[in-house]
Amino acid sequence: MARTPERRVRTLDFAQFCHGEPSSSHGFCRELVDCLRSLGFVKIRNHGISGEEIEKVFVMNKLFFSLPQAAKAKAAHPPEANPHRGYSYVGQEKLSRVKDYEKGKRSIVDVYDIKESYDQGPAVDKLYPNRWPDKQDIPGFRVVMEKFYERCHQVHQDVLRAIATGFDLSPSFLTDLCCENTSELRLNHYPGVHPSSLRKGAKRISEHTDFGTVTLLFQDSVGGLEIEDQNSPGTYFPVSSERKSDMIVNVGDCIQRWTNDKILSTSHRVVLPEDRDALIKDRYSVAYFGKPSRSQLVSPLREFVKEGEKPKYSAISAWQYNQEKLVLTYGGDEEILVPKPSSSVCTGVGQLQ
């Protein structure tokens, strides 16, 4: 797949939305939607999460993945898709299997992803409790992670309000679809490797789209993140961060489905450096994956389907959609069980049946 260095992801100031005058706030929302429509990605500064908070979670990121394998395995993700919590070793996930999911295709070739990860949900989730490492192995880990999760949850809600406002909808239009908190926070570590040890076709993460609403990403300066140019399918260009506090926001599949492709979930990947003469450095990132309520449908909403236009997606719950992709990612054929809706699950807004 080709690469092009010409394109750039725009950077917006979130303070305009949170603290600006009404005209400035609304202008930000329109520009945000324009960025997401054109690239599916945007960088945001002054988002409300301090540099100190971000640095703390990166410290915990490095500490966790530097633990002995036996210590990380105490919080192990199961071999199958569920519960999607805890530590996944290098090669356990295979995102190449879900690359063409929306096209009704399933990849028969597994691409080896060179990363390990740790997944966490909300502090209270009766269906999927979090899996924590032992306190004595990494003191303070749980406190830092739970606090950072809550900070990201707040920003996720604000971003959804800004997107809705940019479409001239009620600010709560999208947050009403996410009233049950099921989002996930992930630590990623891409181990340093010597080029001679790499498998053919290996990537740090294969081409994929994110499953949920929007993703909030923080990354170090090592580089490697690339996104697909929507005007030139198959062509990717790099997205770097000048500092860890830069928050990269990208649209997930659920927003694409709700808007009937008015905003697209852009394919992205993490590649290895082209110059492989020396040891390839470790890379670290932190991602918050916003998710809808589990019982919420992720089919097109009437607010985004013009008269005479057909919905492009059939009705499916956010839960089932997420599970189908997870089962492919972890390589299992387990049955997808739909949970009973909790009393807090919202009923949906303007859903086309």
Curated annotation (Swiss-Prot):
Keywords: Dioxygenase, Iron, Metal-binding, Oxidoreductase. Fe cation binds at H208, D210, H268. Its cofactor is Fe(2+). Pfam families: 2OG-FeII_Oxy, DIOX_N. Residues 181-292 form the Fe2OG dioxygenase domain. It catalyses: L-proline + 2-oxoglutarate + O2 = trans-4-hydroxy-L-proline + succinate + CO2; L-proline + 2-oxoglutarate + O2 = trans-3-hydroxy-L-proline + succinate + CO2; D-proline + 2-oxoglutarate + O2 = cis-4-hydroxy-D-proline + succinate + CO2. 2-oxoglutarate binds at R283. One of its GO terms (biological process) is small molecule biosynthetic process. Belongs to the iron/ascorbate-dependent oxidoreductase family. This is 2-oxoglutarate-Fe(II) type oxidoreductase ppzD. It comes from Metarhizium rileyi (strain RCEF 4871). The lineage of its organism: Eukaryota, Fungi, Dikarya, Ascomycota, Pezizomycotina.
